Amino acid sequence: MENVGDGSAAAPVDSYRLTEEIQLEKNKKEMLQMSTFELKNTIAELEQRLNSVEDEGNEWKTRYETQIELNKQLERQIYILREKSENIRGNPTDRLSSIRSLDQMPVGALNQFVKHLDDEKILLENQLKNFELRIEQEAKAYYKVNNERRMYISEIAQTSVTQEAAKKQQSDPAHATREKPAFKAKYNGLAKRRTMTKRRGGMTKGSHPSNMKH
């Protein structure tokens, strides 16, 4: 009878342990599937937009939408972790029962459960490092693009000043270019008249000696 009692006591413990492990595996599988699905969609969208990026506005729009997707993914993971923490906390009775179930677990099952928790911890740490790396890369890209944007703004400002100066120069010499041919014609006319006057004067002076000889 004692053996039967021990078996009946061990059965709920094993059932609870298996249920808890199955639930943890389901949660882990859901997280991985969700992360994989969202990352695939994000990569596909980025590859599609990479071919269609034409200006800085589209690039920043892509970065903004990517960051929104990452934020949504983090929010979902936070929600799942909160649910897990609430399930672990529960009410005092549930906590005591979980403690008793852990106390009654065999050493092998406890080691397996601890290993599962360690694997989940490593998974979360890797995800955290991945997000930190992405944030660092996005920050570097932001500063780079921001510096380029400032440089472009400076070049645009200088070009605008040069363009305004060119417009003023084009508006001022326009009047001078219209008057220049007339002035040149007048000058040429005066020069021709002076030349003809000099020639006539020379011919007049040259005719006086011939008249005196006769």
Curated annotation (Swiss-Prot):
It comes from the Eukaryota. Residues 191-202 have a biased composition (Basic residues). Keywords: Coiled coil. Residues 165-182 have a biased composition (Basic and acidic residues). InterPro entries: DUF4600. The keyword Coiled coil applies. Residues 30-144 form a coiled coil. Residues 161-214 are annotated as: Disordered. Belongs to the CCDC169 family. This is Coiled-coil domain-containing protein 169. It comes from Xenopus laevis.
